[in-house]
């Protein structure tokens, strides 16, 4: 099994009551298979609720609890961890913190939104795309560049909304400005 290493992508959050949400999405390398076992690459993400940033991710051919444990260990410790109830999350040892294993999507809205942003902005992750990366390293590099830009965008968005004088939700910039 070929794997790509982990990367810590965001600074340690300053507030004490932090929430991290974990989720995974799948995609294909080379082409979309015609068999029933459709998934062959997993992108596992760990997202901070506030600020909305990707604090850890991994791209691999498997989504084992050991791999998720590496993502959890590479990020700063948080107060709460929320997941979507996949059984592999139960086997993960969280760093002495309270663990919430959620059985529905109500506590994972942030990470589901970030995964939707990943599929929106990265053409090779779009569901009905005909684009596929040929190598796992290429997919890793594309996601690495996007995560860096996404975290810069999130920090700029929080700073802008903190300093604004109006109640408008429009931003004078987008995530594409940070690529």
Regions found by a protein language model. Give the residues of each.
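Residue-level recognition of single "structural anchor" positions
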Residues: 1-179
